[in-house]
Curated annotation (Swiss-Prot):
Listed cofactors: Zn(2+)
Enzyme Commission number(s) of this protein: 6.1.1.16
GO (cellular component) term, any one: cytoplasm
Organism (species): Thermotoga maritima (strain ATCC 43589 / DSM 3109 / JCM 10099 / NBRC 100826 / MSB8)
Location in or out of the cell: Cytoplasm
Family: Belongs to the class-I aminoacyl-tRNA synthetase family.
Subunit structure comment from the entry: Monomer.
Leader sequence segment: none
Disulfide links within the chain: none
GO biological process: cysteinyl-tRNA aminoacylation
Protein name: Cysteine--tRNA ligase
InterPro entries: Cys-tRNA-ligase, Cys-tRNA-synt_Ia_DALR, Cys-tRNA/MSH_ligase, Rossmann-like_a/b/a_fold, tRNA-synt_1_cat_dom, tRNAsynth_Ia_anticodon-bd
Keyword Zinc included in the entry's annotation: yes
Length: 460
């Protein structure tokens, strides 16, 4: 298996530190709003990568964090008139709802920043003791000039970064590139006690601490979006290696950005399309297919028109699978030469820098073969193709997966549809049918009320 390592810029043979075990850390969301398709891409891509590692026989220990204290969370809390924890708890719950809807499996660990504050303080103290960090009146900062390998991951030179620095000016810092480890509290902000006064952790230190505490001082894979390479991942690496003197992560994997309306999809610009809306309109497999049909390192253009096309393609495969399932011939095929050839092609694709576009195309090829085999009444081949889609490759890619439920229509959607039908019947003066719908709904505890602005309902 070969993957592109951002650290070296090369496609390298993947060899884990401990044979048979892969330890990986994926940067998770800052929880202050619903996740959009751009947020979902790394979560989905690296979940599928984890599934593939498991398919290849590895035991995977995966960590994905939640940043549950941050300026954006504090601003959202102030805007809503609630405390920061309410915002974080709410949007972590909403994240799980969307992740489940998209078929993203939980990692082994989902640490929250606020659960690791004591550990963060302890590690900042060690960095200060080692001379890599210093205190000012605004907090504690990492001294980038003290870490000789700073810029190694992002291929940036300190001198060039300082010359082009657009960092917020803080005259208490030794260099504009020095980044915050501990922020002194502002009035009214959530804070924790520390040797440097009350405050809260900086963004970069939290991921370093959580990954080291859970996975160890050195682990196999650190992953996330390419927009995190600098400064976030560069700073994580600097902190960890200054602390331990060891290689932090051996392989760095980064997915390309999602572009929407010509620009990077981003909450800060309002240029977003939420996962919830995408799944609701076009189904889980349509969005999964769209994301996996692009190589993870390439940028991905998003539009509703494109998503609609992917959704239609997925529906055609579901129709072929449904047609086969009606035959009732759901057995286990012989593992013959054709079976082995497809497995080899699948593994060859994903072993080559996780080439999901090729792997996904195999499923659609198999679907065409399945359709033809059914037309030819070739039951043996049909079973083989069906098995490969639903039981062999589907669970790895999370597409057409027997282990996942098909998209369900919610009871609320069905109720709204019934109300729409009833409104049409009333306009056509077909009161016998409209009243029958109203009365049957009342029997199951749903009370309709006709108003000038439309029909409202309550549930008893």
């Amino acid at each position: 298996m070969r993957i592109t390592n951002t650290l070296t810029g090369k496609k390298e043979e993947f060899v884990p530190i401990q044979p048979g075990v892969v330890r990986m850390y994926v940067c998770g969301p800052t929880v202050y709003d619903l996740i959009h398709v751009g947020n979902a891409r790394p979560a989905l891509v690296f979940d599928v990568f984890r599934r593939y590692l498991e398919y290849r026989g590895y035991r995977v220990i995966m960590v994905q964090n939640f940043t549950d204290i941050d300026d954006k969370i504090i601003n959202k809390a102030n805007q809503l008139g609630v405390d920061y924890k309410t915002v974080a708890d709410t949007f972590i719950a909403e994240y799980w709802r969307d992740a489940h809807a998209l078929g993203i499996r939980p990692a082994n660990f989902h640490p929250r920043t606020t659960d690791f504050v004591e550990d963060i303080v302890e590690i900042i103290e060690k960095l200060v003791e080692k001379g890599f960090a210093y205190q000012t009146e605004t907090g504690v900062y990492f001294d980038v000039r003290k870490f000789e390998k700073y810029g190694e991951l992002s291929k940036k030179k300190i001198e060039d970064l300082i010359a082009g620095a657009r960092v917020e000016v803080d005259e208490t810092k030794k260099s504009p590139l020095d980044f915050s480890l501990w922020k002194k509290a502002k009035p009214g902000e959530p804070c924790w006690k520390s040797p440097w006064g009350e405050g809260r952790p900086g963004w970069h230190i939290e991921c370093t601490v959580m990954s080291v505490k859970i996975l160890g001082e050195s682990f196999d894979i650190h992953a996330g979006g390419e927009d995190l390479v600098f400064p976030h991942h560069e700073n994580e690496k600097a902190q960890a290696e200054a602390l331990t003197g060891k290689v932090f992560a051996r392989y760095w994997m980064h997915n390309g950005m999602v572009r929407f309306l010509g620009d990077k999809m981003s909450k800060s610009t309002g240029n977003i399309f939420t996962v919830r809306e995408a799944v609701k309109r076009y189904g889980r497999d349509g969005l999964r297919y769209m994301i996996l049909s692009k190589h993870y390192r390439s940028p991905m253009d998003f539009s509703e028109e494109l998503l609609q096309d992917y959704s239609r393609a997925v529906k055609r495969v579901w129709e072929i699978l449904g047609r086969y399932e009606k035959s009732g011939d759901i057995g286990i095929p012989k593992r013959n030469a054709v079976y082995e050839e497809y497995v080899n092609r699948f593994v060859e694709a994903l072993d080559d820098d996780f080439n999901t576009p090729v792997a996904v195309s195999l499923i659609f090829e198999l679907a065409r073969n399945l359709s033809k085999a059914m037309d030819d009444n070739d039951r043996e081949d049909a079973l083989l193709y069906y098995h490969l889609i639903r039981r062999e490759f589907g669970p790895v890619l999370g597409l057409f997966d027997l282990n996942e439920e098909k998209k369900e229509v919610s009871s609320e959607e069905l109720l709204k549809l019934l109300i729409e039908v009833r409104d049409v019947l009333r306009k056509e003066k077909r009161y016998d049918l409209s009243d029958r719908i109203r009365d049957r709904l009342r029997e199951i505890g749903i009370i309709l009320k006709d108003t000038p602005s439309g029909t409202e309902y309550t549930v008893e």
